[in-house]
Swiss-Prot record:
Protein name: Translation machinery-associated protein 16
Entry similarity comment: Belongs to the TMA16 family.
Keyword Nucleus: yes
Function description: Involved in the biogenesis of the 60S ribosomal subunit in the nucleus.
Length: 194
């Protein structure tokens, strides 16, 4: 008995019914892949921002200085927070030229101002994350870093705050705290008199 011929061309895919279980499975799989790609892109963008920040800090380091104090780290951080000042001046200069209609570069200006505001709030609040340049061992590792984003986990970070920049608490804050306690005691005494 002769055997039937096998098709030599590509096999046609069966058409999937749109309401079938297989169609639902493929749709879920596609959504899952899109979500993975989106998260991957967001993570890459975050890593790029951190990498740019670390490269900026690395360029600001003095190669002759073996160790940095907390005050030095605060000064470098202040310079980092003022890194857009020149660009903002250029935008203001372009906008001040007479005869121009509208504000040029307004979206870039808004992004810069939001970034500065957010970073300043972090620095004055809970703390702004910088590479740990105060510790000599971590500083050495940071100086040897070549900008590779895959080696970011090797670099230790430290939160630095403007209010925590002094090593000892100021006496002014203690005096104001004592005055507040005295005012509370006086208000409690006046309430009890009623």
């Amino acid at each position: 008995m002769p055997k039937g011929r096998k098709p030599k061309g590509p096999v046609e895919k069966k058409v999937i019914h749109p309401y079938s279980r297989k169609a639902a499975y493929l749709a879920r799989d596609a959504i899952k892949q899109e979500r993975k790609e989106k998260l991957k892109g967001e993570k890459a963008q975050r890593l790029n921002l951190v990498g740019e920040k670390l490269l900026w800090f690395q360029n600001q380091l003095n190669p002759d200085k073996p160790e940095y104090t907390r005050q030095d780290a605060c000064e470098i951080t202040e310079r980092y927070l003022q890194r857009f000042d020149g660009e903002l001046e250029q935008i203001e200069l372009a906008n001040s030229i007479k005869g121009r209609q509208g504000r040029q570069h307004s979206s870039r200006e808004a992004i810069i101002k939001q970034t500065i505001e957010r970073e300043r709030a972090q620095y004055e609040g809970n703390g702004f994350e910088i590479p740990d340049i105060i510790n000599a061992k971590h500083l050495k590792i940071f100086r040897e870093w070549n900008g590779d984003l895959k080696k970011l986990p090797c670099i230790k970070m430290r939160k630095l705050s403007a209010k925590g920049s002094d090593s000892k608490p100021s006496t002014v804050s203690q005096d104001t705290h004592m005055e507040e306690e005295n005012e509370e005691d006086k208000s409690l005494d006046s309430d009890s008199d009623l």
